[in-house]
Every structure is written in structure tokens, then in C-alpha cells.
Amino acid sequence: MDALDRLAEPGLDLLGRVDTLLAAGAPEGHRLWPLLRRMQVLPGAAVREFLDLHPAPLTGAGHAVRRLVRGYDDTCAMLADPVAWSGPAAGAYDEARAALLRHLDEGPESLVGRLESTAGYADALADWVEGSRLTLARALADVLRSAEAVTVHAATRAGADAGRLGAHAAAEIAVRVLGVLGVAYDGAETLLRQWAPSLAETTWREQATGPYRHGGTTRIGH
């Protein structure tokens, strides 16, 4: 359990009240409006969805992919073992073996290269989630102890008249929370742009080969 989990219950209670007030309309001309148009969600609902994001599954995914890399390394080691034979068939086999080795583990466009990039992307996303959760927790801590929180609680009591003060306080809290989430999602989009070239599907890289000769002698050494 991290700081965001600990603040989830009081934070969602406050933001639920904020959502209730904003559902009746945010103050005209308030700086919240651009955020609402961009995010298309009220702060309570946005935080509730974000709470489901945790770094551990992404970290675990990175470890799992790296275990696959070790399997590819073992396969490549077997393919690289010299074969004691010669002749046209041996030459054709060596060319096919070299092409397969290139496809499996030669450079960032190989299968191993793509797996390593996938693991790195999972790690980067895990760091993003961890950092974003901490930043959001700090924002929630700030709004929970703010004067606006007191106003929102008073405006949403049974029988209370929300009034302009309640709507303004709710909008101020929403700006802080949605602003943090907007920056967080910008970070996720930046990560995707940075990693996308390294995550593209790898394709078989043909190597030009000469014509095979048939009918020659194949010699197998001991």
C-alpha cells in the first residue's frame, strides 16, 4: 500500500462531493473549463480509474520478458556451435543458420532486441506509474487540508445551499487534481512516442545468397 492507497478513501469522498457540485455547472470562465474539455471526465471519476494503476504488474511483466531472453540466448548458443561437416549441403545449412542467428539476436531489430525493448518499456511504464501515483497523492493531501475542502464539505451537507462559493471551491480542487492527471497522461504519451520505434514488429531479414550446388559430396567430420 502506497501513499495514494492510504489517501484513497478520504480523497474519493471529497472528490465525489466535488463531482456533485460540478455536475450542476462550473463557474463561467473558470480555468477548469479547458481541463474538462481536454480530460472529458470529472476529478472523482478520473482518480477512481487511476487508482487501478499499479507499478508491480508492469515490473513483473518486464522480468517475465527478460526470462524469455535467456531462452533465446540458449537457442542462439546451440546454433552457434560449429558443425563438423562440409560440402554444398553444409554450406546451405551454414547460410540458413547464420540468417536465423541474425533474426534471433543481432541488433535492436532482432527478436531478442525487441524483447529487451519491451522489457525496458515495461520498466519505464512502471516508473511512470509509481511517480504519477506519488504526485497525485501529494495533490490529494494538499486539497484535503485546503480551505476549499472545508467549503465543499459545507456546501454538500444535507439541506445546504451549494451557492457560488461551493461551486468555486469545487472548481479549484478539480483544477489541482485534473492538472496533475493531465501531466501524468502527457508523460505516458511521451513514453509511447519514445519507445514506439523500438517496439515495432520485427521482420525476417533476407540475406542475399548464391545459388546452391547439388550433387556434390558432403563430408562429416568426427
Q: What residues fall within each predicted segment?
A:
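Intrinsically disordered, low-complexity Pro/Gly/Thr/Ser/Ala-rich repeat tracts
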Residues: 1-45, 106-117, 121-222
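Short amphipathic alpha-helical segments at helix-loop
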Residues: 50-53, 57, 103
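Short amphipathic helix-turn modules centered on a small-residue break
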Residues: 27-38, 43-44, 50, 63-101
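Short, charge/polar-rich alpha-helical segments
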Residues: 55-64, 124
